[in-house]
């Protein structure tokens, strides 16, 4: 069932909110690269290897910390909002593609659409100062097989998640459940309901003490809502579609 849905795509969880998506044709897409200082990322996976695209939902360190070094190392194109794109260009990264909410761009063999997210966004520069990072967003990534994955980024639940479901029909949602600075498991269950998805990977929990939400709480709230969900609790380093 899951293999059929993925259509040859592989999804590797690298910890926190970082995922590598590998297309059937071998293209590699990294979402929210937080690797070197990520306590959840297995040491052997902190070097990403070949990479084509980097998607950045917002500028906070736990989503953006390794975007520039990885882009330098691999030559991957960084896709992010205008402010983050401008910043990475100022740091010498030539391959940068601005994308904003509601816009869709073809990047290699996939289509990437920017979606709304309710959070904050700032960039901590190398000298320790903080600059404006534009507005946060999520992404819907559509593969040539028709498989669609929604990475919500950091966000609260919001009513227009229903619209994301209606317009794009994601098959799989990667949803934060950590609470306090992102959705709680309770809100994440309602996000799954609004999106109308059947498959969810919980993310952005347990990395730091202020992210106490758990997959068990998420599963309980989903069950109380009567949702028929397949919840894929992935350990860092695990892969869907292998």
Curated annotation (Swiss-Prot):
Coiled coil, from the record: none
Domain of life, source organism: Bacteria
Pfam families for this protein: Lactamase_B_2
InterPro entries the record matches: Metallo-B-lactamas (IPR001279), RibonucZ/Hydroxyglut_hydro (IPR036866), UPF0173 (IPR022877), UPF0173_UPF0282_UlaG_hydrolase (IPR050114)
UniProtKB keywords: Hydrolase
UniProt GO MF annotations: hydrolase activity
Transmembrane spans: none
Homology family: Belongs to the UPF0173 family.
Name of this chain's protein: UPF0173 metal-dependent hydrolase Rxyl_1261
């Amino acid at each position: 069932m899951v293999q059929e849905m993925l259509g040859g795509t592989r999804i590797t969880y690298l910890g926190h909110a970082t995922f590598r998506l590998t297309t059937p044709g071998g293209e590699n897409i990294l979402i929210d690269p937080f690797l070197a200082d990520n306590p959840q990322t297995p040491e052997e996976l902190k070097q990403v290897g070949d990479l084509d695209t980097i998607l950045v939902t917002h500028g906070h360190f736990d989503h953006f910390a390794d975007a520039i070094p990885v882009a330098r190392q691999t030559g991957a194109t960084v896709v992010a909002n205008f402010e983050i794109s401008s910043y990475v260009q100022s740091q010498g990264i030539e391959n940068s593609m601005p994308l904003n909410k509601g816009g869709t761009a073809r990047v290699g063999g996939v289509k990437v659409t920017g979606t709304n997210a309710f959070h904050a966004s700032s960039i901590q520069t190398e000298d320790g100062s903080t600059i404006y990072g534009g507005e946060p967003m999520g992404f819907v990534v559509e593969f040539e097989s028709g498989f669609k994955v929604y990475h919500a980024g950091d966000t609260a639940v919001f009513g227009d998640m229903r619209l994301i479901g209606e317009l794009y029909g994601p098959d799989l949602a990667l949803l934060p459940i950590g609470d306090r600075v992102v959705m709680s498991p309770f809100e994440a269950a309602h996000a799954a309901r609004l999106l109308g998805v059947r498959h969810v990977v919980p993310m952005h929990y347990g990395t730091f003490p202020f992210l106490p939400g758990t997959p068990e709480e998420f599963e309980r709230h989903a069950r109380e809502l009567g949702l028929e969900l397949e919840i894929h609790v992935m350990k860092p380093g695990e892969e869907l579609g292998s």
